[in-house]
């Protein structure tokens, strides 16, 4: 499960991406990363 995310974090996109296993893109919809195959 992803750690809490913050839209103010410049690295959040990468963190969510890594959290989602690098598949598709992990996007931050505070307060959590959403793993969607965009």
UniProtKB/Swiss-Prot annotation:
Superkingdom of origin: Eukaryota
Gene Ontology MF term list: chloride channel regulator activity; toxin activity
Cellular location(s): Secreted
UniProt keyword annotations, A-Z: Chloride channel impairing toxin, Disulfide bond, Ion channel impairing toxin, Knottin, Secreted, Toxin, Voltage-gated chloride channel impairing toxin
GO cellular component: extracellular region
Listed PROSITE patterns: SHORT_SCORPION_CHLORIDE
Tissue: Expressed by the venom gland.
InterPro entries assigned: Scorpion_toxin-like_sf, Scorpion_toxinS_Cl_inh
Disulphide-bridged cysteine pairs: 2-19, 5-28, 16-33, 20-35
Family designation: Belongs to the short scorpion toxin superfamily. Chloride channel inhibitor family.
Written domain comment of the UniProt record: The presence of a 'disulfide through disulfide knot' structurally defines this protein as a knottin.
General function of this protein: Toxin with unknown function in healthy organisms. On glioma cells, interacts with chloride channels (probably ClC-3/CLCN3) and MMP2 at the surface of glioma cells. This complex is then internalized via caveolae, thus inhibiting the chloride channels necessary for cell shrinkage and tumor propagation.
Name this polypeptide is given: Toxin Lqh 8/6
Annotated organism of origin: Leiurus hebraeus (Hebrew deathstalker scorpion)
Lineage: Eukaryota, Metazoa, Ecdysozoa, Arthropoda, Chelicerata
């Amino acid at each position: 499960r992803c750690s809490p995310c913050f839209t103010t974090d410049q690295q959040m996109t990468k963190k969510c991406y890594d959290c989602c296993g690098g598949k598709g893109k992990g996007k931050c919809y505070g307060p959590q990363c959403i793993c969607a195959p965009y």
